[in-house]
Amino acid sequence: MSSATEPVGVPPAEAPDIHTTAGKLADLYRRNHEAVHAGSERAVAKQHAKGKRTARERIDMLLDEGSFVELDEHARHRSTNFGMDADRPYGDGVVTGWGTVDGRRVCVFSQDFTVFGGSLGEVFGEKIVKVMDLAMKTGCPLVGINDSGGARIQEGVAALGLYAEIFKRNTHASGVIPQISLIMGPCAGGAVYSPAITDFTVMVDQTSHMFITGPDVIKTVTGEDVSFEDLGGARTHNERSGNAHYLATDEDDAISYVKELLSFLPSNNLSSSPVFPGAEVEEGSVADGVGDADLELDALVPDSPNQPYDMREVITRLVDEGEFLEVSALFAPNMLCGFGRIEGASVGVVANQPMQLAGTLDIDASEKAARFVRFCDAFNIPVLTLVDVPGFLPGTGQEWNGIIRRGAKLLYAYAEATVPLVTVITRKAYGGAYDVMGSKHLGADINLAWPTAQIAVMGAQGAANILYRRQLAEAAERGEDVEALRARLQQEYEDTLCNPYVAAERGYVDSVIPPSHTRGHVARALRMLADKREALPAKKHGNIPL
């Protein structure tokens, strides 16, 4: 085991005599040194000037000190086209191998922009394919560090073939081992499809770019003027497209996020997530374990159902130490997704955010949550759902862009999930959105509600206008105060149906609890569900509405 930036052995000052044992060893050290320093000093200096590290420096940042074991260090390309045979650096522009992160094994590849611009050729691709196969065989996560100009044009279709080999392995590994992509520079053309298939993509502000076709091609074909940053920058993919899951301020931040993310995940779909020492909920009455932070939940939900509150305040009071690692925080902010721990064990959190679009479900929020729920289900991570949803976002834009089909993805994700599912309704749960957000009817195991919950077909205002349309019209004809009557009828509807007790009477809610008792109830539910076993009907695969 070694550092990625330190070659094994000291290179000889002069050409060694390879006819002796000592000379052969010296020759090995020379080759190792050339492999580690494959990029020219000028290329490395340019990389550093952009605020970017080299491929090997990034591996050293990611892995535990001294844990890196390199593969194919001496591999070189075989191309003779366009004078390529005159320049055959060791490693061929990508560093591959394995090591540990916090003592847990991971496989890694890191593209080297200082060698051929990180372009992918046949040997380059074969090295990535080999380490992907190793990750699958050994059941460990794969971290890919991308910094590449794209396919190596000089090698022609061989490069394209290796891209497809990589895509195929990304697909086969999906749901088997966690796959994380770090975009540390350009990632263009067909190369973008590998990160797209992986589970999480992290980009660095101002230095990362992903796009199928670049600004110049777009200008030529469509006449549009767009910058690299606006077209495919880190902020664009975090805020607008949703292709990235974290916007890092720099490379240190990006790698720190990946290391923290790995701490919540199992090594593969047959193992369990790491369990850390956490604040355990004591046996006995749930009320006995209520602390000051828990009591703050009792006053969190405003009296007015139309006044927002921050759902993050709920999440941080339920998870250990208030630590919540959010995923896709800048995309579809009306839906919160991320990881926390309860009693030291990982849990995925899905929550409506009343501070954004009143917590409504739209296309982006539905797809964001659906992907997250499916990831948690694939890797046996329980899902905690916090519900405050007034419905689906209305509008022609949503309807014409496929909210029916795309919103159904979230329903599908919950219905096919077999991991422990615990749902807490904090306030609104209206109409079809109630069904979609981890309802008992879709298979949730434990459904809890706060006394502030309003579980109904629709809100009081809309319901009163429909139920009492004739009565309101007659009052208007008589010259009575229609608004006062409407307010009274709305209150009557709220008192009758907008509460958690109608659902509780039917068993759709297992218990109505004080907000301050939520952590205790959730912890006990997850403890009880730890050995849950559930099987779906036999099938090749379902047909999710893509």
UniProtKB/Swiss-Prot annotation:
The keyword Transcription does not apply. Keywords: ATP-binding, Ligase, Nucleotide-binding. Its EC number is 6.4.1.3. It catalyses: propanoyl-CoA + hydrogencarbonate + ATP = (S)-methylmalonyl-CoA + ADP + phosphate + H(+). Residues 21-540 are annotated as: Carboxyltransferase. Residues 1-20 are annotated as: Disordered. Residues 292-540 form the CoA carboxyltransferase C-terminal domain. GO terms for cellular component: acetyl-CoA carboxylase complex. Disruption phenotype: Mutant lacks PCCase activity. Mutation has no effect on erythromycin production. Residues 21-277 form the CoA carboxyltransferase N-terminal domain. Pathway: Metabolic intermediate metabolism; propanoyl-CoA degradation; succinyl-CoA from propanoyl-CoA: step 1/3. One of its GO terms (biological process) is fatty acid biosynthetic process. One of its GO terms (molecular function) is acetyl-CoA carboxylase activity. Transmembrane segments: none annotated. Coiled coil: none annotated. Belongs to the AccD/PCCB family. Probably a dodecamer composed of six biotin-containing alpha subunits and six beta subunits. This is Propionyl-CoA carboxylase beta chain. It comes from Saccharopolyspora erythraea (strain ATCC 11635 / DSM 40517 / JCM 4748 / NBRC 13426 / NCIMB 8594 / NRRL 2338).
